[in-house]
Amino acid sequence: MDLSIETDRMPFEGETCDGKNLLINPGGKGANQAVASSRIGAHTLIIGSIGNDAFGEDILHSLTDSGVHCDEVISTDNASTGLAIVIRTSGNNRIIIEHGANYILPSEQVIEALDRVACPGDVFLTQFECCEKTTCDAIIHAKELGLYVIVNPSPVHTIPKHVFNSIDLLCLNETECMSLFGLRAMDDFKSIDRSLSQLLANEAQTIILTVGDAGSIVVTRGQSLYQQAFRVDTVDTTSAGDTYVGAMAACVANGKSLNDAAVLASKAAALATRKIGAQRSIPTLSEIERFFEKGERDD
């Protein structure tokens, strides 16, 4: 669950600032990405854990209302539902998370769920809001089942070398790129392109780097594509990254090329910044088409 508050500027250490426009909304990276995937049009099922509390109930309702199948979500009395504190300022944000029930989700639970519901050729998407062992075990098992594995290493997390071999698509932002590979996204895209291409020799099959309003770059073995960001009137960037990743997963699942997927994911992420809040801001496919193809552009 996201508790989000707006302020004129980020407080300094030890400083208290006035805030306004408090929002309490369903969120969480996995949940946001699942909602984005479903709203883009992919059959989406989420595996996860929530606390047996009011926040957990709210999250389940939000997921099901968005068409996400939640049969593999467990409820526990041993931890509270995961929580994020979001501070918003003029289109930017900082986020602190408390993992809660996400962190006690055992590997066995995820592996058994994958065995029940996954089929070869399906897309498996994960990030690191669950514990490392569970996440890494799930990545490896998903690949063994013949799934296309997409990993978003967020919160920033080192990925063990042996796990990289099971990743088809690594989708990361500039902070994650710097932490994992020591590459500064503010360098020119040609330098980043060369560096990411070198990483592909030993890492994932495809790497996508998102750089906010500077766009994104899709690097595969043999080619790369720069995708510009779409300009809109930005209000809140909280769910932009999750929307991009979820939309990318949906597009891949629906058979789109990575190039076409990057275009649609960029549009979805841009549109998600026009509203305040996490899941409430994630657009549907029809909203994206109407906004970008029928003249409802901000510019």
Say what each PLM segment does.
Residues D115-A118, F164-N165, A201:
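A short, aliphatic-rich alpha-helical micro-motif
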Residues H157-H162, F189-D299:
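Conserved phosphate-binding/catalytic region of the ribokinase-like
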Residues M1-S49, A54-D65, T234-V235, D299:
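Glycine-rich phosphate/adenosyl-contacting loop at the front of the ribokinase-like
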